[in-house]
Swiss-Prot record:
Biological pathway: Amino-acid biosynthesis; L-methionine biosynthesis via de novo pathway; O-succinyl-L-homoserine from L-homoserine: step 1/1
Intrachain disulfide bonds: none
UniProt keyword annotation of ATP-binding present: no
Cellular localization per UniProt: Cytoplasm
Site (Important for acyl-CoA specificity): residue numbering on this chain: R325
Reactions that this protein is recorded to catalyse: L-homoserine + succinyl-CoA = O-succinyl-L-homoserine + CoA
E.C. code: 2.3.1.46
Name of the protein in question: Homoserine O-succinyltransferase
Domain AB hydrolase-1: 51-360
Originating species: Pseudomonas putida (strain ATCC 700007 / DSM 6899 / JCM 31910 / BCRC 17059 / LMG 24140 / F1)
Keyword ATP-binding: no
Record's subunit section: Homodimer.
Role noted for this protein: Transfers a succinyl group from succinyl-CoA to L-homoserine, forming succinyl-L-homoserine.
Length: 379
């Protein structure tokens, strides 16, 4: 019996792997002699290869952005609400590419991959990466797919930083940049949150200096704590209050330090437990450092407008009112710099109670604004 997927789903998708044997020079001064990128595509590339859209993922994201890998999958890809027939990124119009970034832990070459020089996992020996390193690796994937110029590059959070970096590093190769819930650089507070998360991992006795795979263990406790800290910053006070309030798991207090008493405690522990079973600790360290290091305006003395002076793309910048991790003020910094540089930009600030995670939640105004912009650029 055939499985019936929703009409607006891309249906079953099969991940693909691209191998690159040309060395990739990295910002840290090291290089990778070879590497692999896992990716998925949705829709059809037109004859002129002018309808391609690149999806850049956030910290814990991956290549599986839409559709299903098997009929038995409980959930579709992480951005299925935005990718598919009739959705904002309409696969009847666009050819969509979504990849797992270099350094990831979902098939692309990363710390958990085998280092061909040693026959063991890279672990902590995997080089530190930057957003621009990812962009260079993504450009090679575009070359492999025969895509000279992207109709649009779209990303939320860390993905938005990649989209912005693309327009600066390869200005002729991007027509539109859709940057959602992002920032031109991290604030001191954001760097601090990342450092707390890293210390949770680094001080876990099971981390073993990053060589935990050799020991047959994982730093589960550290990963759990890192995820719990991060997850709090992705939500808003309003959404947490609405979802959990001060509700107890049972009808009484236990007056101890070990019981899970509040519903919000139970939720955070569940999120941490689930995350620690599927994500690599070294990848988490890499991703947070890439976030911390992102500061493209540093090359122009902190002047973002000067940094953007040479870009060719048009921009759509979106933010959410209760996002305190990357607040609307941070998005407006990008908008102001683009206007000062006399670039085409539209800005949508969306009233949403969901905090930073709002870019993943298909609220009506968000979907309408997103669709309106993508409809304007469809070939």
């Amino acid at each position: 019996m055939s499985t019936v997927f929703p009409e607006d789903s891309v249906g079953l998708v099969v991940p693909q792997t691209a191998r690159f044997d040309e060395p990739l020079a990295l910002a840290c001064g090291r290089s990778l002699a070879s590497y692999e990128l896992v990716y998925e595509t949705y829709g059809t590339l037109n004859a002129s290869a002018s309808n391609a859209v690149l999806i850049c993922h956030a910290l814990s994201g991956h290549h599986h952005a839409a559709g299903y890998h098997a009929a038995t999958d409980r959930k579709p890809g992480w951005w299925d609400s935005c990718i598919g027939p009739g959705k904002p990124i309409d696969t009847n119009r666009f050819f969509v590419v979504s990849l797992n970034n270099l350094g990831g832990c979902n098939g692309s070459t990363g710390p958990s991959s085998v280092n061909p020089a040693t026959g063991k996992p890279y672990g902590a020996e995997f080089p530190v990466l930057t957003v621009e390193d990812w962009v260079h690796s993504q450009a090679r994937l575009a070359d492999r797919l025969g895509i000279q110029q992207w109709a649009a590059i779209v990303g939320g959070s860390l993905g938005g930083m990649q989209a912005l970096q693309w327009t600066m590093t390869y200005p002729e190769r991007v027509r539109h940049c859709v940057d959602i819930a992002s920032a031109p650089k991290l604030s001191a507070q954001n760097i601090a949150f990342n450092e707390v998360a890293r210390q949770a991992i680094l001080t876990d006795p099971e981390f073993h200096g990053g060589s935990f795979q050799d020991q047959g263990v994982i730093p589960k406790r550290g990963l759990m704590l890192a995820r719990m800290v991060g997850h709090i910053t992705y939500l808003s006070d309003d959404s947490m209050g609405e979802k959990f309030g001060r509700e107890l798991k049972s009808d009484k207090l236990n007056y101890d330090f070990h019981s899970v008493e509040f519903q919000v405690e139970s939720y955070l522990r569940y999120q941490g437990e689930e995350f620690s079973g599927r994500f690599d600790a070294n990848t988490y360290l890499l991703m947070t450092k890439a976030l911390d290091y992102f500061d493209p305006a540093a090359t122009h003395g902190g002047d973002l407008a000067a940094t953007l002076a040479h870009v060719k793309a048009d921009y759509c910048i979106m933010s959410f009112t209760t996002d305190w991790r990357f607040s609307p003020a941070r998005s407006r910094e990008i908008v102001d710099a683009l206007m000062a540089a006399r670039k085409n930009v539209c800005y949508l600030e969306i009233d949403s109670p969901y905090g930073h995670d709002a870019f993943l939640i298909p609220t009506p105004r968000y979907m309408q604004g997103f669709s309106n912009y993508m409809n304007r650029i469809a070939i």
